[in-house]
């Protein structure tokens, strides 16, 4: 049987019926809810990727927050867990290369927080930021982490 569903990405799904016309936000909300129902009916997790809006680009901290989910508050409401991936070097060319942050913004049955990681872009490989064999020091990484949930 099916153990997991991965959907890349929510805003590409079209759930409109032939005889109804929805606004974009209502359509995304309907799709989000339908996927939540599907997950419950099948008894399997669904990993649903979604775009974020550009609001974070106007803030000092570029780390995405729940309000940045694009086109629907229903995504935040329907999801059991919401995580964002942030790479400071995307916004700041002087930032340390290869360092990322996984922000657990919502976790229905657990704690939220941020987890630092390293990534190797040419290999599309992610590794533990605390691994001292990677570029950078543990002290630098620890200064990047807050409230690690795991």
Show the residue positions of the predicted features:
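C-terminal regions of RecA-like/P-loop NTPase motor modules
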Residues: 1-2, 19, 33-43, 54-150
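Helical hairpin unit composed of two closely spaced alpha helices linked by a short loop
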Residues: 2-48
């Amino acid at each position: 049987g099916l153990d997991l569903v991965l959907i890349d990405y929510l805003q590409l799904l079209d759930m409109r019926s032939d005889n109804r016309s929805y606004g974009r936000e209502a359509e995304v909300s309907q799709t989000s809810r339908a996927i939540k129902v599907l997950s419950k009916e099948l008894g399997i997790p669904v990993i649903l990727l979604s775009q974020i809006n550009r609001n974070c680009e106007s803030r000092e901290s570029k780390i995405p927050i729940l309000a940045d989910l694009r086109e629907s508050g229903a995504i935040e409401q329907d999801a059991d867990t919401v995580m964002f991936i942030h790479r400071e070097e995307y916004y700041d060319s002087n930032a340390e290369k290869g360092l990322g942050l996984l922000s657990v913004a919502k976790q229905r049955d657990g704690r939220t927080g941020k987890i630092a990681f390293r990534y190797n872009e040419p290999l599309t490989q992610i590794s533990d930021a605390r691994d001292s064999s990677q570029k950078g020091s543990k002290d630098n990484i620890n200064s990047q982490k807050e409230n690690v949930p795991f």
